[in-house]
């Protein structure tokens, strides 16, 4: 002991190395307040560094107690050395402030005698000399408590130089209480406590009794002080330590911890420099012991030092290693501990409560962290879920003791899965912020979802994070330190703060992950509400799928005001809970949550959320879509983690409210795009339809007002998120979803979008007065003030919408005017009967009319950017809004805006390209837009495509420009797509022919963004068969219109070329005249389908894969372009299709989403980006998210459905053509992949597109060879599309389809569908393009598709459903079915891509059961899914068909399918295969 003490006091102190914390101690140079009591020699070092004024005296003085090394290190800063534990109060006792604090008097007597003979270390003379009052002006700073039990005798007399010092007389027994700075020690002599030069005393053997005299508290303090060398400033060092060592065996249960929190020095390797002292015998000690816990019962107490763990010496072992050793022991732990009993002074007791260890928070990061985490969580209101998980990980390993807390809270954990101790804190912590609340719930993994959503099937979602929560619980309990006594707790308070500090780091990181990606952190900052709202957009992406379930609810409960109110309020209130847990995961929960409060607003929000793992959850969603609302909590909690792991896009999505940021381009799209994106993007947008800040002008109704407010709030939040890349990727999807659910709001949004679009993009669209405008207005009214507001731009939006509509519907205006109430005047192309204005077909026709007019009037005139944005927005949103029920419009708008934003984004990134694309797009838009009349936002897609496919655009533009540009202005419709769409639009709008035209549009273009639920099928193939099917149903035409939108030129470049091929080959000669009408008839008869498919699917699909710009332009002019340059169009189309397939397969829906986005315009764009680059494709990402889960699945079904729409009017001729075209398209599509590639490279989404392109190319190589195969797929696609898209499906299943297809809503029957419709639309788009390549469609589907081609006209009415079912062979077999029918289709869609993709190729695998597939079949299948990149791994691992059904996520990851989208695509495709 003496030697230790000597070493301590001598220059060669046990702690020679400067402690890691020295710097810190040095820092407070002149502050006596926080001396590190435990600083020993090392601390001397510190002492110098942070010497108080008095300590500054002389280096010599300060050096007295410093080791030579220390002196060298801090020769001039003696203060550090004299740090005293507490503040020093002058006076006998006050001389040693720390003593006073500790109860120095009591120790005084005890410690007076122990003196250290420090004389040798410091020259008394020097010290004395150096000690001048000035030098030591005030109380010395106590560096650390002296080792208890040492006795010192004064060898030199000393007279106090400064107040607080004590006189020493030779021979006096001095009890050294603490080591201070400047060579001064604090001690008691003759009843006086104060400072004296260390040189004046020498150590003598101390009496054991003295050591023992000190209470354990004193010893602990001393030990801790020594150990921490200044870590524990607040503890006085008791002179005496009673050391008792004992070996205890701890046996705990699995669900509990050992009940102690371990703290200690952190070191990767044993700290050999550490010299155990009686006061600090080991590096690791028990910071806290849960009362009643395992450790407590075994006799362990706070402050015990760990000597051995499982019979291994850990005296010098670092914290992490010790924790790992404890963990390795499992539930059995043998600990040898040393209890250093410190003398307890009254002060000490207080101090003792929070033993120095707690104070050591900085030193012991892990243990400390757990507490600190807890404290921080509480303080910060951060979600404990993340922290808990982190903590659990850390603490569990670090300290099994903490586990004990869990054990104590083990019951709680079992009950709540939450630690009792932490439970409260986390709860309070969580509750403060939405994220916090979510965290708490997440932690619990129970209450959150349930409370959040009354009928919450979201429990499961919470369940996801439950494990995490539990962990957190343990951590929480640990944090709470249930075992800690009240006294200790007090002590813990400071540690808690420190812990908070420590925790904050872990917490933040932990928290952030759970809040998918970085969202949780961001959202919380905004505000629970904000966070929730934005979150909701993210969920909205999920919502895309959700909509299917919520369509009806959404419709009913979409009052804009209510919605926004609900969204904002609910989001804030419930969002907090769900957001984290369910946000990501449970589309349903969010829906439920939203529904109750404001079905629409909530829906939107949910939708955004839903996309998180669209693909993975597609199946789920399909079934749970109905009660999706049950999972409000999902908002953030569960998916957060999942998304990170699985769905970066989705995660982004969940978090993505920021994704909405991606939609930011909506700004450029002004009101409209903003609307569309806003809806998804901003709470306001989400809430109010498209109530972006600009759109928030929905003054007309309370709904509008409420939404406006909500939107603004959300906008702010979203703005905040926009800045976060993660959010960006999700934004589109969310937005889309958000728009979809509240049809009214969406419509408002739509209108504003359209209006905004018109204003911004098509200032020349003052055609508001046109009948088109009137219908829009009607829609606005329909929506109520909300819609008008959403249109927003106050009255402007409405007129804007009309305007946008007007220009677009210039020629179509008459048609429109006939249907101010809706596209009611439009005649069904097939049946010749008047279409319901809200019917998808009518909407599509209206959109097409608008597009035609627009193209005639001023597509060219529109600024490139405006044009892009506007067509996307207007066509997609505007037309669909007017034509389809408001819900459809809403959804379409949503999609449109997404698309449009995407377009804008592209614009900004690829201005040059965009402009060129714009020209092209103008042509395309004129064609497609005319055809679509901005139906269901396909135009939007178009527009988006143009900007997106900058390079492709150039590529295609050159071709298409040659081809399309001529048609562009005179008759965009004449183009392959325009023919179908443009001509059809004009025709359909004015007369029955129009309806067919529309149908054709749907069939040919499947461009009805809204109707897109049918997925603008793969351009040629899907188009052919699906077109027929689509023709069968009324709603098909609208989808066709969307098909126009489908024409997303850039994306269409490839897709349209395929369509063009179809059109060219098929309708090629029918008439791709510039005149819309002539084009339309041709389309309706022959090329309608091809055009529709090409335009819709190819464009839609291609755009996402490539640049949307190029594709979009090509897509719109696709028919013409295709005719002249089928190749180009096909390339786009192929890309689109492949992309969509690829996306589905590779990106789990991102790509698909991209396709889907294209249908909507935005949705399509969104889809694409998510797969490759979330940020890049923000819009797409947003959509992507929505599409991810819902869209993708829906997309398949919808996609399938969509192709049929293209051929509805001219099913017979068109289908035959389509079949041909499909093949060419397929070949071209596949063949054009390279071309597509270029487009893909262009634009902000170049990365995503490139990736998609590569996938497409791979797919193309395999599929292009087999046009038949492509046809095959299209058949499936067509079928799928047909069902959703068929008029009956559209109208009947409007809601249904909505669910499945985003645009289903547009067809308009149900507003709820709008929400879901949108995503489905996107999906359908994606699906369509997928279908075009028809990789997924099974041979049966292929046959079907091909077969239907000839009989489309007759089949149109009857076949749609059957085709869908047959084609899909997926869950969605009822085309006309209900939401679910569509949703199933949509859900199926999710698998559908798989099916589509499977059949896409003529490879053998398409003809045999999965379990009989050989390795090459599996490779071919992957290729068909655009996942050829994984072929080699699958082959290398000898994965054959028998393995596929058993592949788990982990297996896929092991096989290199790390992308959530790819994995989801594979899973979905597998599900489809197995369901077939």
UniProtKB/Swiss-Prot annotation:
Tissue-wise expression: Detected in brain (at protein level), where it is highly expressed in Purkinje cells.
Cellular component GO terms, alphabetical: apical plasma membrane; brush border membrane; ciliary membrane; dendritic spine; growth cone; neurofilament; neuron projection; neuronal cell body
Keywords of this entry: Cell membrane, Cell projection, Cytoplasm, Glycoprotein, Membrane, Phosphoprotein, SH3 domain, SH3-binding, Synapse
PANTHER family per the UniProt record, alphabetical: SH3 AND MULTIPLE ANKYRIN REPEAT DOMAINS PROTEIN, SH3 AND MULTIPLE ANKYRIN REPEAT DOMAINS PROTEIN 2
Organism field: Mus musculus (Mouse)
Domain spans labelled SAM: 1413-1476
Localization: Apical cell membrane; Cytoplasm; Synapse; Postsynaptic density
Gene Ontology MF, one: ionotropic glutamate receptor binding
Protein name: SH3 and multiple ankyrin repeat domains protein 2
Entry-annotated residues carrying Phosphoserine: 456, 586, 724, 1334, 1338
Pro residues bias locations: 512-528, 1202-1212
Family: Belongs to the SHANK family.
